[in-house]
Amino acid sequence: MMETINAQIIINKIENNEVQWLYNHFSEYFQDVTSINDLEQILSNYNAIRGQNHLYRHLHINRHQEYIWFDNKMTTGVSVFLNKYQEIIGMTLVPIKHIRGMKQSKQYYTIPIKSKCFVYWGGDNELINYHYQYKNQRLAMDLIKVEDGCTYNGDSNQCENYHIYGLPIVAPANGVVEEIVDGISDSIPGEMNTVHPEGNYIVIKHGHKEYSLIAHIKPHSFKIEKGDELLRGQHIANVGNSGNSSEPHIHFQVMNDKNLQVTQTLKIQFHNNIAPVKGDEITYNGDSILIEKEQPFSKIAKNIHTNITHLFKG
């Protein structure tokens, strides 16, 4: 009979350094790539600096679950992934870095899609935003679409089966097309194109010397050209899976320079003053963006953690 594991059980085992119990609940593959001695050291380092943990989100989709905790001092965070067999297939324990002086956009923006979407990566720390560790992507967000608890219907190896694939991408604010890259094929979901990580993308120049980037666009779907003036909400292309993308989604960021290598991202000011983060579902209706917190679902990337992620120094 399958043992039922819940959030309280997991975090209690982590806080009490119950290494053997945790290791016994790893999937077979996770055990193969994880040393029990490393796990013991990681837990010891983590518990030496953490505060009192509180469950932040419980997300589940495609028969996988993710639990996320932060401590009351916001100094540490934990993420644990479970598969449909209640086996642990991923564990992340990180100190929370608080970077000061991050600038906010002066321009107000909408999300670049008019369909309801789900924030898979987004926020101001690396536990809920994978991009945070990279200066030129730090405040970016990734958007997917979930229907009936799934990101796709049918064969997960086909881009066309993902709910967000092919949907219209719209301009997030008025601006001028600064740059377009096109002609890069969509990848098979789960197979990343690391040679062209952004895939097909567009850079739009807005007011206040701000730029937006939308990446992983479907090839040959652009409706506009370099130099065109855009209005907020204008259809500019369609969602694809080009570049370093695990499955069809929208990568969106606002930045202070058009050069993607040296730019710094800005904290996006959205209409309605919302601040979407991982686990939020967003709906865009003209001037309004509605946000729903604590949605009971999330996307599980194909290349899920293959080992314990930790940044604690022993």
Summary of predicted features, one role per range:
Residues 1-16:
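Short, low-complexity N-terminal intrinsically disordered segments enriched in polar/charged residues
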Residues 21-60:
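Short solvent-exposed beta->alpha transition segments
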Residues 59-107:
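Exposed beta-sheet edge and beta->alpha loop/turn motif
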Residues 130-192:
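Short, glycine/small-residue-enriched coil/turn segments at secondary-structure junctions
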Residues 174-218:
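Zn2+-dependent peptidoglycan hydrolase active-site motif and core
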Residues 175-177, 227-239:
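A structural signal for short beta-strand/turn segments enriched in small hydrophobics and glycine
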Residues 196, 223, 228, 253-314:
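Acidic, glycine-rich catalytic/binding loops that coordinate metals and/or anionic ligands
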Residues 210-233:
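Short histidine-centered loop motifs in beta-beta connectors
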